[in-house]
Amino acid sequence: MNIGIRQHGRWIPIAIAALGFVLVVSGVAAADRSTAPGTFVGSDLITEDVEAAAKFYRGLFDWDMAKAGDGYSIHHKGRLIASISGIEDGDPEVSRSFWLVGIVVNNLKGSISAAQKNGAEVVEKPRKVSGGYGTFAVIRDAENAPVMLIQPGKTPVGGTTGPGAWVWAELWTDDIVKASQFYTDVVGVGHEGYDRGGKPYHVFTSQGTYRAGIIEIPEELETVKPGWA
């Protein structure tokens, strides 16, 4: 549900984060977008410069921000939707800024078990968040892409709409078929395949709604590693 600064190889919570990466044109109600499997409702911007990042996103989206430890919590329309935290000095696993996204699952324990069976590594064991926001864990998927798995609690998070709301997420992968099956098994979503200019493009679906896209990394982009964007 939330993560924060990384210390001694672990993500330490500093603020409840909830980024609703959902397709707003779906017409699904906000509460559904916050709880349906495959919905993106938690994210932490891990950055080299916390203050610069906060200034940039505050100006870009007019988000409301509040200090949370050494970082910030981010609110949109009164709901907590994200957090910003700094990269720990000397952390070999994090060398540059990135958004760590979170995906809703119905059964966190079951999803972790499925992830491990499919080649994932558990980075942060399940951690309950106070305030009724639920429980989260952090894994690296079969291609080493970091992602949060979130089992929501009673307190609603994310699910906002309009300017400043999040509307989509996309997984860049070296193997679109393998990645699609991994998240189908782990998250409990379906996936549909399309042809986009002669290139395969898959979409995660749940409850009749498109949740995110999957694209295979072009051969010419040799330095791009699998990950969520």
Protein language model regions, located:
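Core segments of cupin and vicinal oxygen chelate
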Residues: 35-37, 41-81, 117, 123-134, ...
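N-terminal secretory signal peptides that target proteins for export/translocation
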Residues: 1-9
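Bacterial N-terminal signal peptides
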Residues: 13-24
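N-terminal beta-strand motif that seeds the catalytic metal site of vicinal oxygen chelate
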Residues: 27-54, 98-103, 148-180, 190-192, ...
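A sequence-level detector of short linear motifs
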Residues: 82-83, 148, 212-213
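A cross-kingdom feature marking solvent-exposed beta-strand/loop segments within repeated
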Residues: 32, 68-73, 80-104, 109-135, ...
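Composition-driven detection of intrinsically disordered, low-complexity segments
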Residues: 11-12, 133
